[in-house]
Regions:
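Short, flexible beta-strand-to-coil junctions
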Residues: 56-60, 98, 121-128
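Generic structural hydrophobic/aromatic packing signal, biased to beta-strands
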Residues: 53-55, 62-65, 111, 119-121, ...
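Short, surface-exposed beta-edge/turn micro-motifs
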Residues: 49-53, 89-91, 116-118
Length: 198
């Protein structure tokens, strides 16, 4: 069984077992997360009073299960997942927020710095109901202040967002922006030292 990452101290044996079983779960690739999986991690999160996060690869496999504290998760070293110019990491992060808040500044910083496909916060109440899921993705060619775009909150019954198509479109835009930048860089340049007239 794969290991849990993060703040696992003090968990009961059955809580640890249920968290470890999350590695067996699959998400339809076009869904950001399945309703059942979102409901289950929300319930576990409220039971242990800690945020729970999942890093899900593009085929829908849970690659990392992360246990945080009441306010945040710490994403472990994911350098084994490739990242190349014009490409995203190949992982999306979905995690719970215990107080129902939207994505935090830390979440958005992780999204941008780690080049994640998508960052999501599952806003769940204590009964396990999921009123909304907040999502964001990197904004290719962003020239403004923020390098990401916040999407409208999703309802739990609308989780098929065409995830793979969205990611492919983002990577195409990133590659185009990179090739334009490369073309501009490759132009011949000259430095004028002096101009004199007779």
């Amino acid at each position: 069984m794969k290991k849990l990452y993060g703040n696992t101290g003090g968990l009961k044996a059955n809580q640890t077992r249920r968290l470890e079983k999350l590695y067996r779960r699959r998400v339809p690739p076009d869904h950001v997360i399945s309703f059942e999986l979102a409901r289950d991690i929300s319930g576990l999160s409220h039971e242990i009073h800690r945020q729970v996060g999942l890093l899900i690869d593009r085929s829908g496999r849970v690659s990392w299960v992360i246990v945080g504290d009441h306010q945040k998760i710490l994403i472990p070293d994911i350098s084994s997942y490739r990242v190349a110019p014009g490409r995203l990491r190949g992982l999306r992060c979905l995690h719970t927020h215990l107080k129902g808040e939207a994505l935090t500044r830390d979440d958005l910083t992780d999204l941008a710095m780690l080049r994640l496909d998508i960052m999501g916060a599952i806003s769940a109440d204590t009964d396990g109901h999921i009123p909304q899921i907040y999502l964001s993705h990197i904004l290719p060619g962003a020239t403004g202040k923020e390098p990401y775009q916040l999407l409208p909150p999703l309802k739990a019954n609308a989780l098929n967002i065409g995830c793979l198509d969205l990611i492919r479109a983002l990577e195409n835009e990133l590659a185009q922006a990179r090739s334009l930048h490369k073309a501009a860089k490759g132009k011949e340049r000259a430095l004028l030292i002096s101009v004199t007239s007779k």
